């Protein structure tokens, strides 16, 4: 008699910088979602795959939620996140720093209205110095979610992830596995490399040009020594933006190249050569009334 298998779709939601990318990477034991301390560097839903014996799930990293959204790009990301919540079997609701405000309540209300299975997870417990605040905070959340598990973890330190995984497995629907057991993500190398370069540049630029560049025409080759040879083009709207990305004496773009190489080599375990060219294409962006740029491609 064939044993039952379990498969489901999971999304991690929460504010910016609560550790969503770190948690995804630690659960699937692979660095597919690039981690940055700067807020809002995750713009796309990164999909990881976990498989262990009879259990398998897709797990989605999502852009960080905010109390206010300043442009149509941010608003679209959040609409996409809510749509994905609607399509998911289980929601991991990640919180930290004793923050429980309107956006958290709004997310929870949406999840409960859709009658979704969910787990509230308090992350970064290793950084909590005032332990006496923890119990009142848990009790506060419990008033909004009386029937939910509240699990305390440290994703970075891999503390109590086994408890989280046990709870996830209990909630997975019975279904056939979708992927081979060794697969960690649906994305190919080129996409992940593009994400690494994009997030590295966003980290270096911070708020200067967060939405005002596109990474295009990524070419990935391997030489006879299995070394990555990567070439990509960064497209900007005008000369001023190009100068900002290049930086004084080329320092910023050189940092982007060096930091990206380091992350690519760590992720793929391959020596890497990276070349970046910056081009100006004015028609790639259209300026909105609020002064923000929208990708018009």
Curated annotation (Swiss-Prot):
Era-type G domain residues: 6-174
Keywords, ordered alphabetically: Cell membrane, Cytoplasm, GTP-binding, Membrane, Nucleotide-binding, Ribosome biogenesis, RNA-binding, rRNA-binding
Any single Pfam family the record assigns to this protein: MMR_HSR1
Region (G2): 40-44
GO cellular component, one term: plasma membrane
Domain KH type-2: 197-282
UniProt region (G1), positions on chain: 14-21
A biological process term (GO) from this entry: ribosomal small subunit assembly
Membrane topology term: Peripheral membrane protein
UniProt GO MF annotations: GTP binding; GTPase activity; ribosomal small subunit binding; small ribosomal subunit rRNA binding
Region listing for G5, in residue ranges: 153-155
SUPFAM superfamilies: P-loop containing nucleoside triphosphate hydrolases, Prokaryotic type KH domain (KH-domain type II)
Binding site for GTP: 14-21, 123-126
Top-rank taxon, per record: Bacteria
Residue ranges, annotated region (G4): 123-126
Chain segments annotated as transmembrane: none
Location(s) in or outside the cell: Cytoplasm; Cell membrane
Region (G3): 61-64
Role this protein plays: An essential GTPase that binds both GDP and GTP, with rapid nucleotide exchange. Plays a role in 16S rRNA processing and 30S ribosomal subunit biogenesis and possibly also in cell cycle regulation and energy metabolism.
Subunit structure: Monomer.
Family: Belongs to the TRAFAC class TrmE-Era-EngA-EngB-Septin-like GTPase superfamily. Era GTPase family.
The protein's name: GTPase Era
């Amino acid at each position: 008699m064939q044993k039952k298998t379990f498969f489901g779709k999971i999304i991690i939601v929460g504010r910016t910088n609560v550790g969503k990318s770190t948690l995804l990477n630690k659960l699937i034991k692979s660095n597919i979602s690039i981690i940055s301390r700067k807020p809002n560097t995750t713009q796309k839903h990164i999909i990881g795959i976990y498989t262990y014996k009879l259990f398998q799930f897709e797990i989605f990293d999502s852009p960080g939620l905010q109390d206010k959204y300043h442009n149509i790009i941010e608003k679209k990301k959040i609409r996409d996140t809510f749509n994905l919540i609607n399509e998911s079997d289980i929601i991991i609701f990640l919180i930290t720093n004793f923050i429980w405000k309107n956006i958290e309540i709004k997310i929870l209300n949406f999840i409960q209205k859709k009658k979704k299975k969910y787990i509230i997870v308090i992350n970064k417990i290793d950084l909590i110095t005032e332990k006496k605040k923890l119990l009142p905070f848990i009790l506060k959340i419990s008033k909004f979610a009386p029937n939910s598990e509240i699990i305390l973890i440290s994703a970075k330190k891999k503390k109590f992830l086994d408890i989280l995984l046990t709870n996830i497995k209990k909630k997975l629907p019975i279904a056939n596995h979708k992927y081979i057991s060794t697969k960690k993500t649906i994305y190919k190398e080129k996409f992940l490399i593009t994400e690494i370069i994009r997030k590295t540049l966003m980290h270096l630029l911070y708020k200067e040009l967060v939405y005002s560049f596109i990474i295009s025409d990524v070419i990935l080759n391997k030489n006879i020594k299995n070394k990555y040879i990567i070439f990509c083009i960064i497209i900007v709207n005008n000369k001023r933006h190009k100068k900002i990305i290049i930086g004084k004496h080329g320092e910023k773009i050189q940092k982007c190249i060096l930091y990206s190489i380091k992350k690519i080599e760590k992720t793929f375990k391959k020596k890497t050569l990276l070349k970046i060219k910056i081009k100006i294409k004015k028609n790639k962006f259209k300026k909105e009334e609020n002064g923000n740029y929208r990708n018009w491609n």
